[in-house]
Amino acid sequence: MTTNYETMYILRPDLGDEQAEQAITKYQNLLRDQGAEDIQIQNRGKRRLAYEIKKHRDGIYIQLNYTAPATAIAPFERAMRLSEEVIRYLTIKQDIAEEKPPKEEKEKPTKVAATV
């Protein structure tokens, strides 16, 4: 069974554009190898962190939205944890509500006054 996930991770700010793209591609391929589908990548760019993480005040924010089996998350997060380029990451399970068809309203009989 596949589930929708969202992963946000922060890359070190001292990475160049090419190194950042290589890191993004690396994690995208890792997810794809684990059976993920519908991978959407949003590069949020370099932003100031709310607090210092591993002696960095800025970071490159990357957001991934994808559909994957539950077994794909552990190896993906392990690779991020062991990586020097990722300073923080978070994966959440998304609850996407199924659209329910609108209820049809039954017509109520209207009272008609008879005129004589």
From Swiss-Prot:
<comment type="similarity">
    <text>Belongs to the bacterial ribosomal protein bS6 family.</text>
</comment>
<feature type="region of interest" description="Disordered">
    <location>
        <begin position="97"/>
        <end position="116"/>
    </location>
</feature>
<dbReference type="InterPro" id="IPR000529">
    <property type="entry name" value="Ribosomal_bS6"/>
</dbReference>
<dbReference type="GO" id="GO:0006412">
    <property type="term" value="P:translation"/>
</dbReference>
<dbReference type="Pfam" id="PF01250">
    <property type="entry name" value="Ribosomal_S6"/>
</dbReference>
<dbReference type="InterPro" id="IPR020815">
    <property type="entry name" value="Ribosomal_bS6_CS"/>
</dbReference>
<dbReference type="GO" id="GO:0005737">
    <property type="term" value="C:cytoplasm"/>
</dbReference>
<dbReference type="InterPro" id="IPR014717">
    <property type="entry name" value="Transl_elong_EF1B/ribsomal_bS6"/>
</dbReference>
<keyword id="KW-0689">Ribosomal protein</keyword>
<keyword id="KW-0694">RNA-binding</keyword>
<dbReference type="InterPro" id="IPR035980">
    <property type="entry name" value="Ribosomal_bS6_sf"/>
</dbReference>
<feature type="compositionally biased region" description="Basic and acidic residues">
    <location>
        <begin position="97"/>
        <end position="110"/>
    </location>
</feature>
<dbReference type="GO" id="GO:1990904">
    <property type="term" value="C:ribonucleoprotein complex"/>
</dbReference>
<dbReference type="InterPro" id="IPR020814">
    <property type="entry name" value="Ribosomal_S6_plastid/chlpt"/>
</dbReference>
<keyword id="KW-0699">rRNA-binding</keyword>
<dbReference type="GO" id="GO:0005840">
    <property type="term" value="C:ribosome"/>
</dbReference>
<dbReference type="GO" id="GO:0070181">
    <property type="term" value="F:small ribosomal subunit rRNA binding"/>
</dbReference>
<comment type="function">
    <text>Binds together with bS18 to 16S ribosomal RNA.</text>
</comment>
<keyword id="KW-0687">Ribonucleoprotein</keyword>
<protein>
    <recommendedName>
        <fullName>Small ribosomal subunit protein bS6</fullName>
    </recommendedName>
</protein>
<dbReference type="GO" id="GO:0003735">
    <property type="term" value="F:structural constituent of ribosome"/>
</dbReference>
